[in-house]
């Protein structure tokens, strides 16, 4: 994998879990050239942000992107690197016109890093591959398609308290072998609610043929999410608790045929396992996984197996890890919460995984 201009290896970058706001803005705010009222640009009175807007440019770079002024807060006082004004202007033009996906240069005053992947780079097992798969999953979920990830072509990473990836990948429709260039903007967010891993998407789309004509990038609307899906992740629900629960109609016990039909349940399970063992191994080291039981809970008005189609849902998954990094096969429990705000391309996935003997 080749990094353009003074690479920063992803493995060497850690996400701070002490910062609760990244200060990113959306495309429409960028074009408006000023903060819209009520957009939450200042957080003096807000200590409990639930969802972050990652998008592709920070507030500090707003004036630079629009007026090409020197970036505010991005230059190290001890950094003597001089940026060619023409190169800087081209850099921000590429960001603006491609929504942050097609950037082939880097300037030392920006925190954006550009990576081009070789055909043999296997990124499915690291966080970039996971984010690409999540983005494609949500595109399929919303479009009713069945595209499969072939490989990641390139990605841009941006660290500003959170790690955001603008990923360009190749996908295929196995029904007719049609190939597509897929784009997704995914953020690995700070963990706030007793979860092990939190992933948010803002863009999940086929690359537009003409730059600037794709799905519009919009901020997350936290107010649109039901309060029941906010706060800390719920505790594991036992069969005894379920039997005495007054809201049994909100639950559905997933059948084996459902698991085969909805392969994203396997994806959720793999990511949950990854969140437990991250740092010890790559995702491919913990598969295959054997799903033993899945219970889905939602307040949305779906009957029986249709509950799997709910945008807002909580999944209780018990599974066995065959290739655990320490010792023999182990049984696990995972809690996965999926929330949406009604904006196309937006989904938030929170993962918590436990060993059953802990």
Curated annotation (Swiss-Prot):
Coiled coil: none annotated. Residues 58-67 have a biased composition (Basic and acidic residues). InterPro entries: MS5 (IPR006462). Residues 31-82 are annotated as: Disordered. Signal peptide: none annotated. Belongs to the UPF0725 (EMB2204) family. This is UPF0725 protein At4g29550. It comes from Arabidopsis thaliana.
């Amino acid at each position: 994998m080749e990094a353009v201009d003074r690479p920063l290896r992803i493995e060497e970058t850690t996400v701070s879990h002490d910062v609760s706001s990244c200060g990113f803005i959306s495309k429409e705010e960028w074009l408006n050239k000023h903060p819209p009222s009520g957009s939450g640009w200042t957080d003096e009175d807000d200590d409990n942000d639930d969802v972050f807007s990652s998008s592709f440019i920070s507030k500090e770079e707003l004036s630079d992107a629009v007026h090409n002024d020197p970036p505010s807060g991005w230059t190290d006082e001890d950094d003597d690197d001089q940026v060619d004004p023409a190169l800087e202007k081209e850099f921000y033009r590429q960001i603006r016109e491609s929504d942050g996906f097609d950037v082939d240069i880097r300037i030392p005053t920006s925190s954006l890093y550009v990576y081009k992947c070789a055909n043999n780079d296997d990124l499915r097992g690291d966080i970039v591959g996971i984010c690409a798969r999540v983005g494609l999953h949500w595109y399929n979920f919303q479009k009713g398609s069945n595209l499969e990830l072939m490989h990641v072509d390139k990605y841009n990473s941006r660290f500003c308290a959170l790690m955001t990836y603008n990923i360009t990948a190749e996908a295929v429709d196995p029904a007719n072998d049609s190939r597509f260039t897929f784009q997704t903007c995914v953020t690995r967010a700070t963990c706030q609610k007793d979860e092990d891993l939190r992933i948010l998407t803002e863009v999940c789309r086929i690359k537009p043929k003409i730059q600037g004509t794709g799905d519009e990038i919009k901020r997350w609307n936290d107010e649109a999410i039901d309060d029941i899906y906010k706060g800390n992740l719920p505790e594991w629900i036992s069969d005894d608790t379920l039997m005495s629960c007054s809201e049994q109609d909100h639950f559905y016990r997933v059948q084996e045929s459902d698991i085969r039909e909805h392969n994203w349940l396997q994806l959720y399970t793999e990511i949950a396992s990854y969140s437990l063992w991250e740092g010890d191994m790559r995702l491919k080291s913990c598969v295959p996984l054997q799903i033993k039981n899945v219970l889905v809970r939602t307040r949305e008005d779906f009957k029986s197996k249709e509950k799997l189609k709910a945008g807002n849902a909580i999944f209780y998954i018990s599974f066995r890890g065959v290739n655990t990094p320490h010792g023999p096969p182990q049984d696990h429990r995972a809690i996965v919460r999926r929330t949406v705000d009604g904006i196309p391309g937006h989904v938030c996935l929170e993962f918590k995984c436990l060993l059953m003997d802990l």
